[in-house]
């Protein structure tokens, strides 16, 4: 039997986080959620996710700070930024910092 892929959702808006996690569970993924950058980093190191979905507007730190701490790690999982920030400069910055994709919500 195959193990479920683990996806870490770092998103402070509970409604959005719950929606994403429910959709992932329905698609047979194991979703774990964090509502802050520090919690997200802690869960990243304890669960070794296969993918990270990262919001940039977090309450305790900017998502780019989380991204910079995740980039270049030997166990680096792909990171998809999901943000309300739609300026082209924000997208370019996140991609330059190591994000694998950027989706505007």
Residue ranges: model-predicted function:
Residues 8, 33-51, 72:
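Acidic, metal-coordinating helix/loop segments flanking the phosphotransfer/catalytic sites
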Residues 18-26:
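Charged docking surfaces used in two-component/phosphorelay signaling
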Residues 1-8:
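Non-catalytic signal-transmission and effector/linker regions of two-component phosphorelay proteins
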Residues 11:
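Conserved acidic carboxylate
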Residues 59, 87, 105:
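The feature encodes the CheY-like receiver
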Residues 55, 83:
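Active-site residues of response regulator receiver
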């Amino acid at each position: 039997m195959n193990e479920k892929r683990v996806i870490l959702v770092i998103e402070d808006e509970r409604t959005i986080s719950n929606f994403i996690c429910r959709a992932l569970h329905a698609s047979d993924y194991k979703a774990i959620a964090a509502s802050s950058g520090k919690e997200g980093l802690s869960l990243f190191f304890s669960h070794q996710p296969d993918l990270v979905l990262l919001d940039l507007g977090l309450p305790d730190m900017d998502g780019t700070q989380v991204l910079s701490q995740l980039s270049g790690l030997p166990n680096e999982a792909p990171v998809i930024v999901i943000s309300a920030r739609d300026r082209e400069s924000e997208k370019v910055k996140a991609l330059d910092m190591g994000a694998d994709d950027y989706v505007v919500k």
